[in-house]
Amino acid sequence: MKHKCFISYKKDDQYYRDKLVELFDSADVIDKSLNRFIESDDGEYIMSVIRRDYLKDSTVTLFLIGSHSSENEGNDWYGRPRNYFIQRELQASLYNGPRNTRNGILGIVLPNMYDEVYDGTNQCDVCGGTHRIVNINDDTVIREFSSNYYIKPHEGCAWSEDERYCTLVKWSDFLSKPEKYIDFAYDKRTAEISNMVKIRNLR
């Protein structure tokens, strides 16, 4: 694999993270996750520290979407988001700084979330076609992901792949062709849609 990956995941999903580490060559994955709060009100500083100390030279972030990886997990005893680390990892992944380019982001839907995320199809009243129902929202993912999967403003009755920055795949499909999906996420970094990436003011 030619693109170095950073894995953003909830500790509950350690099993799947370990499987990815086994799948990749050690040179292709950063075996480290954000594990401390960065005490600063300066968003630029926070993102630059995470890029420097954690994401380093990665170019694609793999976001494991499990049953506790959503925006709606609430806060901890200190009033901080329970998924603070994932939020910050995705923010830093999207950050296009002076010494780095943003990462491509590939959301990998874990098996216990298939039915929550993939909800069949519907017949469109606007175009008459059939669209897949994909539930990417605060109940399933972090807002940094959903806001860059369903990017607004948007015209039309559905989003094409060219109209999304974040990409999505089932765990089983990813395992069958990991390089294909990683390459696809990597290529988003220079695609026109990268100019529509949203990082700030999402909450």
PLM segments and residue spans:
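Short catalytic/ligand-binding loop motif for oxyanion handling, primarily in non-cytosolic enzymes
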Residues: 14-17, 70-73, 113-119
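Short, charge-rich binding segments
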Residues: 53-54, 95-99
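Conserved N-terminal substructure of TIR/SEFIR domains
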Residues: 1-60, 170-203
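Short beta-alpha junction loops
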Residues: 68, 97-116
